Amino acid sequence: MIRMFVRHPVADYATWKQAYDAFERDRVGMGVRGHAVFQSADDPKDITAWHDFDTLEAAQAFVKSDQLREAMDAAGVTGEPTIWFTTPA
């Protein structure tokens, strides 16, 4: 299992979350097996999320997809995301 973390700012959390939730079917279709979203304790526009994948290749393909980039832009992501991949220790 690969867990991908992503952190990025958003213009408006409620707008972003609605778009994120609407992208569920697409996420599953691109190999996401589980996910969760968090807001920074001192800045609700600072979002961190994790997504689980079966393989690193699936996670990397998800990150590189035009579909994801378009969805993030439409959802109001205002900065370049920081992304990292982990495996269970």
Cite the ranges covered by each PLM segment.
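Short S/T/G/P-rich N-terminal loop/turn motif that feeds into the first structured element of a domain
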Residues: M1-E70, A74-A89
